[in-house]
Amino acid sequence: MSQPSLWKDSHYFIMWASCCNWFCLDGQPEEAPPPQGARTQAYSNPGYSSFPSPTGSEPSCKACGVHFASTTRKQTCLDCKKNFCMTCSSQEGNGPRLCLLCLRFRATAFQREELMKMKVKDLRDYLSLHDISTEMCREKEELVFLVLGQQPVISEADRTRVPHLPQAFPEQQAFLTQPQTSTVPPTSPGLPSSPAQVTSVPLAQDQETQQAVGHVSQDHEEPIFPESTARVPTEDETQSVDSEDSFVPGRRASLSDLTHLEDIEGLTVRQLKEILARNFVNYKGCCEKWELMERVTRLYKDQKGLQHLVSGNEDQNGGAVPSGLEENLCKICMDSPIDCVLLECGHMVTCTKCGKRMNECPICRQYVIRAVHVFRS
């Protein structure tokens, strides 16, 4: 029996067996020596960095973004609880320190009429300072509603520092600005109450003060403030309330609800948009309420002019109306004037009420995509 022959090839031991004439492979490969110059590398964490860890964000002013070099320059607003610098915050007398934006809102005494005069950006910034989301707000009234819902509680010490009142309250303004008389004791030690100081007030101002104090009962020892006063609404406000009551709740506003131009001033933003949408007037790009009021006013005047043009059956001389005026009548109802154009064909043959019901143009039978209101020059 011949001895098996062994040789080494490709790092494997191969043995030739004389019994079966098959190659027999050894399953253990020969370990190759490491190449020269290679060295063992220690394990390293890929998430580890030799650089020092970043420090926390430095406190900065919420308004201007300047970093505070020391804690002495950092001032906290009592209303929104945010940090501001000395420039972006203010303190009136011994009162609390407030940021300029919160100070402006406190000057309005959180009255709805005054808040509606403010810009939308200021309303959003104020709500953002109080961490209130405004993503779902589409109207200015919704922002004002959120501001009124989170107005801060004003303490008794802050009530003595009432902001400047509008011109509608001259007597109250004189009462708040003048020193306290002997009938009403002062609520804080900072208010003068000595007789010598009272006698130094001019006679006219003293009479105004007595008229304002005369409405206060003797057992009521606190001064009158805007939050506790009930004022009589003016004529303009009464007209606006009456005009809003004329609209039935739950029903969309219509141009036929308006009887005079003054009724437009009493409409809300939502009602103005409903009227424009029902008459196919585009109001995109209108950011303020007065822009919507201008378009509704123009729509109202144009509608009245067209109705006056086609309403009479006789002219001024008593004769029949010329047949040429029939061209301005809607070809569907023959009652209302033509005031809309059908797209995409561009034919003007119907009024707004009939145009929104048309599926196809009555002239060319083309499919109507939409109807747009037009104004006659």
UniProtKB/Swiss-Prot annotation:
Boundaries of every SAP domain copy: 115-134, 264-278
Positions with biased composition (Acidic residues): 235-245
Region Disordered, residue ranges: 176-249
Deletion phenotype: No visible phenotype.
Alphabetized CDD domains for the sequence: FYVE_CARP2, RING-HC_CARP2
Source taxon at top rank: Eukaryota
Enzyme Commission number: 2.3.2.27
Subcellular location: Cytoplasm, Cytosol; Cell membrane; Recycling endosome membrane
Primary localisation category: cytoplasm
MF terms in GO: p53 binding; protease binding; protein kinase binding; ubiquitin protein ligase activity; ubiquitin protein ligase binding; zinc ion binding
Post-translational modification: Autoubiquitinated.
Zinc finger (FYVE-type): 55-107
Positions where Phosphoserine occurs in the chain: 240, 243, 246, 254
Tissue spec: Ubiquitous. Detected in heart, brain, spleen, lung, liver, skeletal muscle, kidney, testis, thymus, whole embryo and embryonic stem cells.
UniProt-listed Gene3D superfamilies: 1.10.720.140, Zinc/RING finger domain, C3HC4 (zinc finger)
Residue spans, zinc finger RING-type: 330-365
Subunit and interaction comment: Interacts with CASP8 and CASP10. Interacts with RIPK1 (via protein kinase domain); involved in RIPK1 ubiquitination. Interacts with PRR5L. Interacts (via RING-type zinc finger) with p53/TP53; involved in p53/TP53 ubiquitination. Interacts (via RING-type zinc finger) with MDM2; the interaction stabilizes MDM2.
Full protein name: E3 ubiquitin-protein ligase rififylin
Species this protein is from: Mus musculus (Mouse)
Origin organism lineage: Eukaryota, Metazoa, Chordata, Craniata, Vertebrata
